Each structure stands twice: as structure tokens, then as C-alpha cells.
Amino acid sequence: MSVGNRLRRWLTAGGAAAGLAIGGFAAAPATAAPCETGDFAQWLQTFKAEAMSLGVSPATAANLDGLTYDKKVIGLDRNQKHFKVPFEQFLKQRLNPGRVAKGAQMMKKHAALLKRIEERFGVPGEVLVAIWGLETDYGAVSGKMPVLRSLATLAYDCRRTDLFQTQLIDALRVIDRGDLTAAEMRGAWAGELGQTQFMASSYYQYAIDFDGDGHADLLNSVPDVLASTANYLKGYGWQRGAGWEEGEPNYQALKGWNKSDNYTRTIGVFAKKLAGGA
């Protein structure tokens, strides 16, 4: 999913409030600076103290030390292009023959894993592989920007303070839990992580260890990636055995993944192709 799509999903779903619920805490965020003014380093130390007051360990909070404001992130945030395209055009852009062919290969390669995941969560493999392909081309393009720096920059910014301060706290909690190190936390510019692009609060709530190594690793572990994606959909109301096309029960669960009807419908079309439909 593009960064713009992911942000639209959070914002149209009441992202800040949802993030606070997901993060499991309710506290006034550190004061945001007016746009383009203030002292980022000073704000960061205030935020660090607040993070520790919310239970983040001092060792993990120390990863905030020395972070610098990233003007590139703000530029990308300010210059997002929001426009609607007809569904058929969107579908053609996202669902090229190569992506579909590779998806079919992934269905075969991970058939046993996908069966185990469906047995546990009720989400068919074709839906998970469709999301995986659309998000990052099966892990090929998941982003290389340092997530803590990106989230700190956006949390300091005046426009979405509550949303991104929540995300930053939960990114630190993911580190505290032992799933990833700060150095491993690289993703898209708005903080999306892993092969299906979880925001930090979603990572904290829905990411699970499915390969048995003791860590929920959505960057490198395909079992963790696909099972966590299924767990996310289940958390948004996925019903075992129900349909996912528009008007069917699981369409709304897919919209919990992305509020865009074009994107949700594209997941459905892709999944149907992977299942052997037209």
C-alpha cells in the first residue's frame, strides 16, 4: 500500500483515537511545536521522559537520543497527491501479470503455511497473498527509512501530533518487547513496517510470532508476516467462511485494512484470481 493510502486509512478511521486504544494507554501527548518552529531536540527529551512514564524502558527510550528532524519526511507528507481514479484504471496499475504470476507461485510455495493460518484465523491464503503482493511485492519493496526518526519528526510536527506520538510510543514498545531493534526498524517514510506495512500501533497489537523463534518479525519472517496479517483482519471482524466482495461480510474487514474502495476491491479481485477464479 502506498504511504498516502495507509495514512488515509488511519485518518479516515479516526486514526489518533484508534491509535490510543491500540497502544493501550491514555495520556496527554507531549506538546507539539508550531509548524517549522521550536526546538526538536528539547521536545524529544520531553517526549523521552513521557515515554518512560508510560512504561518504556530507559534502555529503549535511549534510542531517541540523537535523532534529528527529517525535512525529507515533512516534504513527502506535505506533497502527497490525493486524487481519485476510476476503479478499472486503479486495478490495471496495481494488478499486472507479473504480480499475479508471482502470487500464484507464492500460493504454491507457502501452501502448508497458508493452510495452518487459515485453520487458526479463518482467513484464506489467497487474501493474505493478495495483500502481501499489493503492499510490497512480496517483501521486495518495504522501505529503508529509519522509522524512529520518521515517527519522531511527524510526532513533533503540528499536523497529526496525537496520531504519530502514539505511533512513536508503540514503536518503542515493539522494541521493548524484543521483536525488533531500533536499527532494524526501517520502513516507509510515515513509519510503515514490514512486508505488509503495519503501522507501529498495529504491529504492537496484532503482530504475532508464528515461526516459534520468540519474536514477531514482520520484516524477515514470512510465517510471522502472513499470520499477523490474518490476525489483523480477524481483529477487524473477519468471519470464517464468509465472502469478501462488496456487500459481503468480510468486505468491511478488508476496509479495516484500507478505507479505499478501489484498494479493497482490488484485494478481492486479486484473491479471486489466486483462488483460480476469473
Which positions does each model-derived feature cover?
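Short amphipathic alpha-helical/adjacent loop interface patches that line ligand
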Residues: 15, 48, 111
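Residues at the start of alpha-helices and the adjacent loop-to-helix junctions
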Residues: 8-9, 24, 43
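Short N-terminal segments immediately surrounding and downstream of signal-peptide cleavage
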Residues: 31-52
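A ubiquitous short alpha-helical element
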Residues: 30-35, 97-101
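C-terminal segment of classical bacterial N-terminal signal peptides
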Residues: 20-29
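Bacterial N-terminal signal peptides that target proteins for export
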Residues: 2-18
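Basic/polar N-terminal segments that are highly enriched at the extreme N-terminus
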Residues: 1-2, 6, 28-34
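Catalytic glycan-binding domains that act on GlcNAc-containing polysaccharides
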Residues: 56-278
